[in-house]
Curated annotation (Swiss-Prot):
The keyword Endoplasmic reticulum applies. It comes from the Eukaryota. Induction: Increased by salt stress in roots and decreased by salt stress in coleoptile. Roots and coleoptile. In roots, present in the mature region, but not in the tip. Not detected in leaves. It comes from Hordeum vulgare. Glycosylated. GO terms for biological process: cell wall organization. Its main location: cytoplasm. This is Germin GS1. May play a role in altering the properties of cell walls during germinative growth.
Amino acid sequence: YDPSPLQDFCVAD
């Protein structure tokens, strides 16, 4: 889980 603003759509888990 990486709460990155760039991958916020990908790390919703």
